[in-house]
Amino acid sequence: MQRSIKKVAVLGSGVMGSRIACHFAGIGVEVLLLDMLSPGAEQSKLPKERNKLVDNSLQAAIKSNPSPLYLQKFASSITTGNFTDDMNKIANVDWIIEVVVERLDIKKLIYDQVEQYRKPGTLVSSNTSGIPIHLMAEGRSEDFQKHFCGTHFFNPPRYLRLLEVIPTATTDPAIVDFHMHYGDVFLGKTTVLCKDTPAFIANRVGVFSMMSVLHIMEKLALSIDEIEAITGPLMGRPKSATFRTADVVGIDTLVKVAAGVAANCPNDEAKNIFTLPAWLEKMVANNWLGDKTGQGFRSEEHTSEL
């Protein structure tokens, strides 16, 4: 199949969406980055006001360390907008990547809009961390389902090489082959073909590991520093160890993936490992989600309150 990617639409400008946009811009692809209309800007006619949410997210990504861009000038390849005013522009892109919040109902609402404006043959994929791909494809047009799959990037996408490609039973095999090839040759990824099982491969293993550590921590009354000292380079793992990794990934993402596995794998022999400690749920309730909110595991001032 001869297919080229000249322009990509990224739907959702959070930590992952903004950085995926930067990664594509870094390889010379034009990017349309869309998110919700900025709160309180419903009556404004000024794009600057209506796009404040997405613009602020992109600027935060550009200023982050390590940088998501090879060179700062590549940011000029990213055009921002919002779902209300600019969703029609996805008719002019070659690939639509959905990166909105990890809730199936919200993702389906976004796909309703995508179906209104997407031209036939355009690739569509989800960056979900663990929601079953086939649930997002249900009820969609035949052409949508044929060109739809999961493409799961990892944070930060410029530096983490893994890209999981997750087709459904209705995904055209040629589309799967294209994603595997494009991810390898153009995005610089190690592409891994996954079955559409809860949390796929990396998060099924990684979140199991993290949740196991949390339960052991409770049982043995270990501190965050003790866990970090044990589960980092001492074990042959990155220095981000357990809790710094959780802060980067997003504690809300960790919770949603763990809860999703517990709900969708009732017969899994390790199901109890994915049970959430009460203090972890309290962190999410307090909006202590890691780097994205500026408060997570690595702030002793607040984690001591748990």
Predicted regions and their residues:
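N-terminal glycine-rich phosphate-binding loop for ADP-containing cofactors
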Residues: 1-304
